[in-house]
């Protein structure tokens, strides 16, 4: 056991976590040069296309150190985006240490801080690594000072490396062996193993990634899931090198995968404890705290025949992504679907794309909303995650809007732009601290403004240098109203939005204008209106397509032309009474484009 080292690699987006993982695998001979590819751990097509890590991946490597001993390194490559911070905290729960990778050119950024604090809260040993020292813009001395100043950990002798060229990777490995403590646990005690992650395999059933805390897991042994009480037989178990390799047992302190032939999606929940069926442990390990979704949106299959497949797909995906929340929902415009909760907009995009790719579904997404706390005159407090669930205006005492605490790190030359943006988003300044050239800003901004397009706007106003980390702070009373959209006089529930009263007229106007761009012209006029209660605040008309009925009249009397035009008008009127308007997917997401030029 004293030769085992469990650690995670944490960093801000694009600071080189996955590339460093590749180098560690190569140096330790986990894969031959022929099998090696860039970002070998980003196994999903989506991850490779976007160049980001979405799922944490674990690898077991053997490393012979300079002291002649062979160490078993179990490490987990984690995502960097704020939307996937839950993946990071789960990965850290399985480790004794973390490599904090910092780009020697960019320096400390917001996610560096957030992930590092998560690791410190869990009492992990944090080892700073300065990456990308081969870049012309690299300034390791300045960045080491920044780490000490902003993060508050000792970084004078931080290991310097370049994951791209492989320079200094040996030093990183030596540092891991020296600085990260071996796991603690009782090899002779009753079995306790924590499920860090699960996913569904069509042939094997549920595959679970586990960390053995006490005791050992053996092939063909009978085990019990502590949350469900079900007993299973271990069919196969093993480690990732990153190939899936079978072994006969997993001992205390090791990380590996287990297959028990479980077909029920709820059979092996993430955060559950595995113990032996006979003489097992009585107490489960502390699991993970449940995360609350911040953004809700309706997902509906375009074809109603796909509803069953869609439900199964969501079940399998939620097994793999424990932060996804979903419940059935029906809409008059879109039929049956699900109301899904996500951690942020990127998370929502990724889930939708995974559902469409991995399960061949065609989906329509409604505009995302956050959760409002509504105090009603009759039913006490209700939480509203969809505009259609908002009670009638005369039943509402007060609407509480969720406020996010945003920590922004920005170089001082872009400070003015960022403050202007925060004020535009109804933000309140809480704190401002200068660290050399960097400024740490803390703002309280309404969550609805943050999740919509704040991150994109922040990046563009600071040329990509500002970085953001946010979390839910509290609910605050606010003057919110629901803006309904009517098409030819009919309310479309899936298009309603909740917005601040001061912004309602502008938002309504913009929304109607955007919808006009996206709805194709029909044979009759389409009136698009935005309304608050019974008051219409904006209108746009998509003009009808019409045939030139008087083209065949050359000379002759004007009354002949009038007669033909009147006849066409009567036909159009009749058509409008029975005609349906088909809305494309873009029309449902027009709200996302509101305010963008």
Curated annotation (Swiss-Prot):
GTP-binding in keyword set? yes
Gene Ontology terms for molecular function: GTP binding; GTPase activity; guanosine tetraphosphate binding; ribosome binding; translation elongation factor activity
Q: What membrane topology term does the record carry? A: Peripheral membrane protein
Start and end of every tr-type G domain?
Answer: 2-184
Enzyme Commission number, as recorded: 3.6.5.n1
A GO BP term here is: positive regulation of translation
Q: Which InterPro entries match?
A: EF-4 (IPR006297), EFG_III/V (IPR035647), EFG_V-like (IPR000640), EFTu-like_2 (IPR004161), G_TR_CS (IPR031157), LepA_C_sf (IPR038363), LepA_CTD (IPR013842), LepA_IV (IPR035654)
What the entry lists under CDD domains is as follows: EF4_II, EF4_III, LepA, lepA_C
**List of residues binding GTP:** 14-19, 131-134
Alphabetical list of Pfam families matching this protein: EFG_C (PF00679), GTP_EFTU (PF00009), GTP_EFTU_D2 (PF03144), LepA_C (PF06421)
Where found, per UniProt? Cell inner membrane
Task: Report the catalytic activity.
Answer: GTP + H2O = GDP + phosphate + H(+)
Please indicate which superkingdom the organism of origin belongs to: Bacteria
**What are the protein's UniProt keywords?**
Cell inner membrane, Cell membrane, GTP-binding, Hydrolase, Membrane, Nucleotide-binding, Protein biosynthesis
Q: What Gene3D superfamilies would the database entry show?
A: 3.30.70.240, Elongation factor 4, C-terminal domain, Elongation Factor G (Translational Gtpase), domain 3, P-loop containing nucleotide triphosphate hydrolases, Translation factors
Q: Which GO terms describe its cellular component?
A: plasma membrane
Top class in the EC scheme: hydrolase
Family affiliation: Belongs to the TRAFAC class translation factor GTPase superfamily. Classic translation factor GTPase family. LepA subfamily.
Q: Which HAMAP family match?
A: LepA
Described by its record, this protein's role is as follows: Required for accurate and efficient protein synthesis under certain stress conditions. May act as a fidelity factor of the translation reaction, by catalyzing a one-codon backward translocation of tRNAs on improperly translocated ribosomes. Back-translocation proceeds from a post-translocation (POST) complex to a pre-translocation (PRE) complex, thus giving elongation factor G a second chance to translocate the tRNAs correctly. Binds to ribosomes in a GTP-dependent manner.
- Which NCBIfam families would you find in this protein's record? lepA (TIGR01393), small_GTP (TIGR00231)
Q: What protein name does the entry list? A: Elongation factor 4
